[in-house]
């Protein structure tokens, strides 16, 4: 693969909308390019690992074979385990038994991956390097644990939740780590701005123990829109290539109909391939 020196890869989350990002990674593999650095949260982190392990169409096969399986996502899981998504099934049984993940290739990848999760006590993002993953992918579990739909994850002395709360589009992390030029993969169309918000009474009821977490959830839309504006400005300044869906998506975070998800994956491949030459030009600056 052709290493794009000094170009970072920045990945937002988005739940099942992350199938768009997975398609973009397929385009990168088809174009035979790789990045020395990636920073990712939530679904972006979960999907990029198959790109780093060089396993084409692996994420697509997960969708065709398992996304409709109640073990993957169901109210039963939520009632039984407190998590809508069964992360033991997703992060252990699938990669270790059902659809083997190439852990050795992942570990040997030249890409320095950092996965972000939100510290519930401080409201700040904690970054976990690729070397901390292990075969249980605990940082991925933490980064993908959505408010109200998953329990707090305890890892390395931290109480953690969805990385997209504290750092939804982690381009500032990439810049701080020395990558002034970045490819930024989003899961929302041009013109989208976040207006999400949770009732404050519900946050205080559910997360009374974590006032800093409540504050970061309450201000997430403002933070998202600020980071989105930064990404778009970097693109205008010739310091970034932004890849995102061309039209508004009807697919939400929890969408589970395979055919529509596969169409989104195809769209990601299409959008990724369309911008490969732009990415190569960015690397030559």
Predicted regions and their residues:
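Patatin-like phospholipase
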Residues: 1-41, 49-285
């Amino acid at each position: 693969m052709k290493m794009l020196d000094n170009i970072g890869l920045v990945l937002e989350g988005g739940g099942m909308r992350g199938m768009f990002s997975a398609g973009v990674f397929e385009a990168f593999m088809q174009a035979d390019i790789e990045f020395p650095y990636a920073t990712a949260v939530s679904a972006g982190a979960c999907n990029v690992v198959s790109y780093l392990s060089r396993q084409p169409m692996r994420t697509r096969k997960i969708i065709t074979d398992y996304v409709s399986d109640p073990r993957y996502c169901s109210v039963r899981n939520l009632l039984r385990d407190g998590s809508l998504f069964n992360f033991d099934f997703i992060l252990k049984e699938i990669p270790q038994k059902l659809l083997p993940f190439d852990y050795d290739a992942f570990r040997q990848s030249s890409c320095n991956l950092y996965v972000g999760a939100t510290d519930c006590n401080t409201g700040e993002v904690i970054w976990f390097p690729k070397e901390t993953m292990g075969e249980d992918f605990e940082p991925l579990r933490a980064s993908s644990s959505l408010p109200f739909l998953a329990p707090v994850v305890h890892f390395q002395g931290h109480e953690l939740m969805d990385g997209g709360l504290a750092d939804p589009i982690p381009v500032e992390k990439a810049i701080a780590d020395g990558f002034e030029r970045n490819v930024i993969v989003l899961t929302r169309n041009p013109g989208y701005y976040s207006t999400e918000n949770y009732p404050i009474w519900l946050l205080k009821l559910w997360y009374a123990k974590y006032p800093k977490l409540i504050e970061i959830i309450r201000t997430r839309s403002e933070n998202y829109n600020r980071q989105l504006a930064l990404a778009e400005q970097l693109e205008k300044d010739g310091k970034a290539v932004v890849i995102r869906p061309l039209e508004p998506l009807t697919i939400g975070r929890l969408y589970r109909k395979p055919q529509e998800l596969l169409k989104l994956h195809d769209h990601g491949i299409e959008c990724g391939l369309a911008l490969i030459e732009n990415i190569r030009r960015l690397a030559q600056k």
